[in-house]
């Protein structure tokens, strides 16, 4: 998304960040993990601006449970099945560092899934569109046909 605005953007992953959190609720968890990612960025980077983020889904049944990224196709299928035909809240935290000073923002959105048939679930899992995605889906990708944003901004999801 930012690459369209900033053609000379450099995107780098941050390895070995502990993505566990002691926060009680999902919003706190996602913010804490985003802050850990910010701490992992070296202060002497050659960049004018640094952005880190994290996204999690709030379990549709248990508000304090977070749904992150699936580790494999079986977990992805289970997550998509759990979200099928339901609404859920998505939390995103973003940290922006400019001139050595960090500022953090927390946003939420609500997404609703259609009832997903077994065939659609298999198709979504086999497409690998779930890889690296919180809740095992990409609203701007293949899931966009089966889900809609009810509240909030698409950038949050």
Protein language model regions, located:
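Hydrophobic anchor at the start of a short beta-strand
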Residues: 8-9, 48
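A short beta-strand-loop structural module common to alpha/beta enzyme folds
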Residues: 9-20
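Anionic-ligand binding patches
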Residues: 24-156
């Amino acid at each position: 998304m930012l690459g369209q605005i900033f053609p000379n953007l450099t995107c780098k992953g941050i390895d070995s960040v502990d993505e566990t959190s002691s926060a009680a609720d999902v919003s706190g968890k996602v913010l804490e993990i985003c802050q850990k990612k910010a701490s992992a960025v070296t202060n002497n980077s050659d960049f004018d601006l640094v952005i880190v983020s994290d996204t999690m889904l709030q379990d549709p049944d248990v508000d304090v449970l977070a749904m992150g990224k699936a580790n494999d196709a079986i977990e992805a299928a289970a997550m998509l099945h759990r979200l099928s035909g339901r609404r859920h809240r998505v939390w995103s935290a973003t940290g922006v560092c400019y001139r050595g000073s960090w500022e953090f923002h927390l946003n939420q959105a609500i997404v609703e899934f259609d009832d997903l048939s077994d065939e659609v679930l298999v198709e979504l899992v086999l497409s690998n569109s779930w890889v690296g995605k919180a809740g095992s889906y990409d609203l701007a990708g293949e899931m966009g046909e089966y889900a809609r944003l009810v509240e909030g901004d698409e950038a949050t999801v």
